[in-house]
């Protein structure tokens, strides 16, 4: 080897040794103490153990909602360039679709071209204008004159900078994801949950192909199990991931960005009670010593015990479905059962209904369903009461002194008090017959319109409105669930409010007498009707209906809180008035319009059918209200069948409910005691 080259090598090696020695000197002599301190530092890590939500039980301790383990898919922003991120996200969305794991997409534009707006009917009332107005108002650079196609282009070019080359369907997928992720605070810090409760095939594929999905992780979660399928869906509600706005409101209460929260129904109302306390395991790694491990176990949320009887709820829901199927015109309905002694809601049924377990996946389809399955008709639907209001009109007429108990009003088939307005009794319209002389009890039994036309005229609208308010008609009952309607009792003030012309706003004598037979401008919720009938049953006490019986600790079963009967009003009513009205209602099921339904029924009860007109060329709504047993009332029932034609059709639902309540259709099984289920 050349001597010069060898010398050069020696010099380089010598320099390297000098540098190494200098570095060692620096580390030991100059920085030795700081490096020693660093070596003694402890490294800690914390793992969070998610707490399960509290179970929801019926009044006998039978589970309505419990928990199970599942998986969600979360995505965090990484350093991927935008075009690579879009390609990866699209691959993930296709994988989710192909493995049967739906993902949420809240962008209110159709999935496929030609793109159209698809604003959702959030309230289930058939209107989307409020949602559309709100959506546009929250966006600064998107205006109402832009088409759905233009908005897609705007998001592509100016918001998410999505490159060309994607099919219209894939472009819509990507924009939908980016839109939802932005609402969810998608960033390098906050993971966005793109899909909940995914299939095992999804989990397997993502784990096997992890190198293809940078920033994507599979996370264990607790998910709700709805033990009885669609049962009580509108009561129980459901959970879902919080949006950015909810997170800002709740983060100071210990919520994490990807926590699931109650979104509807009891799950939402009792969020603070049902939510558990997460556990933590803290591991401190100490160089040269054993790890220090400290942990706090997760505490499940409290149990919620409802007033609902699972068997009665099931009977009500099945009967609604059965009767809607049997009546060609009927398409929906609701039923409410109350304990007349304390306001417990024993059943609250709606038809059609939905599966709370798949609500998030089915949402777009549900809100576009013309039958409005997510609408809680029992508390939000308002219906013209028809003849079910006649017991209330009778009370107002008797208590105000407008008529007396034995006073007879003659039904000639046509009410001719007014020269220019001559309404008919239903019996005249059907068969050109009359009821003849009627006292108040007979008039209720026979549902004689002519009697109530005259009684209403003599009583006057002010007194009828006053007694309606006494019995809670036209005001919310106070049930714990949101979106309860107030209903409305017909009045001059209301007609003036809704009228669009002076002529429309004018109050006529005909409005008074139409009010007295449950028509005109009166409309109430099924729960209001049930509560007013409960007052007739219990002697005039208006309780606040409630669904929550108690909250109990998941640790030891102790009572955290308990709902006491809350008296909202005590109506003053003479015993003679109650007796006359109750006897009239007894006659309805004994000899009147509901007698065929309840022929030879072993339990005596009192009821009133109602056939309410809802518009020209539309089938009438069918209503039925009742209480039972007659002599010692326990329950009040209200049933509405939309387009059910005749009130006695709704009575069939009430009969099925009473069969279950009184154990007439089966051997009454033993109910499970709540305390047996607690730890």
Q: Where are each of the predicted segments found?
A:
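Flexible helix-coil linker/hinge segments at domain or subdomain boundaries
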Residues: 663-672
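Solvent-exposed, polar/charged alpha-helical surfaces in well-ordered, non-transmembrane soluble domains
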Residues: 83-94, 196, 204, 208, ...
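Membrane-proximal periplasmic segments of bacterial cell-envelope enzymes
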Residues: 1-272, 278-292, 296, 326, ...
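Amphipathic oligomerization regions
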Residues: 642-664
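Short alpha-helix boundary/capping segments
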Residues: 80, 84, 573, 642-650
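A conserved hydrophobic secondary-structure block that centers on an alpha-helix together
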Residues: 291-341
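Conserved helix-loop functional segments at active or binding sites
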Residues: 322-326, 351-354, 587, 663
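Beta-lactam-recognizing serine transpeptidase/beta-lactamase-like catalytic domain environment
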Residues: 65, 71, 283-295, 308, ...
